[in-house]
Amino acid sequence: MSSSLWLQCLQQLQEELPATEFSMWVRPLQAELNDNTLTLFAPNRFVLDWVRDKYLNSINRLLQEYCGNDVPSLRFEVGSRPVAAPKPAPTRTPADVAAESSAPAQLQARKPVHKTWDDDAQAIADINHRSNVNPKHKFNNFVEGKSNQLGLAAARQVSDNPGAAYNPLFLYGGTGLGKTHLLHAVGNAIVDNNPNAKVVYMHSERFVQDMVKALQNNAIEEFKRYYRSVDALLIDDIQFFANKERSQEEFFHTFNALLEGNQQIILTSDRYPKEISGVEDRLKSRFGWGLTVAIEPPELETRVAILMKKAEDHQIHLADEVAFFIAKRLRSNVRELEGALNRVIANANFTGRPITIDFVREALRDLLALQEKLVTIDNIQKTVAEYYKIKVADLLSKRRSRSVARPRQLAMALAKELTNHSLPEIGDAFGGRDHTTVLHACRKIEQLREESHDIKEDYSNLIRTLSS
């Protein structure tokens, strides 16, 4: 009965919740009914607390509907699927060990190299050396915000239960938003949990280079064996596979082999899978088999938190008002923020001056001037009009049809986020509208970004275009 009862609840929750929420928080739950107690198992404490906080009332309501007076009591526990025991490693000769100790990028003609390991610890160290995972990028130094919350939660779940939670996990968004940091954080967490795990991180171009060298050295079988033997494969910027047919063909088979073996795949891209041109449809389809999550430009509070965290790492005191001054003017990505802060700190060290708003304005004058020049209300209006294939005059008009009103609201919200203009100034720029109209538009778009995947995508695309 437990499976059918929970299945009914799942089906109803799937209708009620946004697809991303359902896939991330509810789908991973497992159910067991014993002695009129329904136990829901979450893959980790983070998911358990989130589900209990956000969805407990909905689950209890559905149990009441389906069970009437015989409602089972509800319990939550942290539990994970049993992991199959690893297969015993085949006996290897010293030549085999030496051959496997080189990543495919260095594949050459096979020569027996007599090399022995003192103990298993050396072998593990070698695996970690080959992984290319940056030990500096961990979950504990990743600054969480509304813009990356879902991506961070998914990455944590994958690291706790690789190959089972979400496979593949596909993270997409503009440059410098933290996708690569999350890849490394997952890799580090997997190895922390299991030092014997084979985790490989690489840029997609490295995969292509490895394959080309393997073909040149007649070592394609070694190439296949290397990539298909990993426990987790983390590939950055998958869009660089575009128009590389042979690489796509090989990755297609590698992808299938890893999925069949319950080995984790995490991919990143600068755009949504279906928007990647030059990549075969069968690959784009597979990219969406697991969970696809957008990493968006950080909102103001997150930008401030990032600056404060980086200043702390440098053992520099950064006043709140200074952090807000920088964060309000540099909005596009984390990398830009870090670069600006590094310049400010360097200037302060060279001159011995305290870091004040006036000092920051002087140290970053060229960067701030460029930013103000790039993002103007006029530029926003032109970009939004072009995106929705309407005229700028429509945005300034009194027309209230959905095809014009929604782009106008989006443009107002973008103007509030990307410029330093006040609400009355924004209203004036949109046909002399009142500041309350602008405020309503901003709140409406914020609500729609939570409820509508299309609006969320449009907003992210426009921010990316305006900030590039």
Curated annotation (Swiss-Prot):
Annotated stretches, region: Disordered: 81-104
Protein residues bound to ATP: 176, 178-180
GO annotations of cellular component type: cytoplasm; plasma membrane
UniProt keyword annotations, A-Z: ATP-binding, Cytoplasm, DNA replication, DNA-binding, Lipid-binding, Nucleotide-binding
Stretches the record annotates as Domain II: 84-131
Cellular compartments annotated: Cytoplasm
Gene3D superfamilies: 1.10.1750.10, 1.10.8.60, 3.30.300.180, P-loop containing nucleotide triphosphate hydrolases
Subunit description: Oligomerizes as a right-handed, spiral filament on DNA at oriC.
Homology family: Belongs to the DnaA family.
Function of the protein: Plays an essential role in the initiation and regulation of chromosomal replication. ATP-DnaA binds to the origin of replication (oriC) to initiate formation of the DNA replication initiation complex once per cell cycle. Binds the DnaA box (a 9 base pair repeat at the origin) and separates the double-stranded (ds)DNA. Forms a right-handed helical filament on oriC DNA; dsDNA binds to the exterior of the filament while single-stranded (ss)DNA is stabiized in the filament's interior.
This protein's name: Chromosomal replication initiator protein DnaA
Species annotation: Vibrio campbellii (strain ATCC BAA-1116)
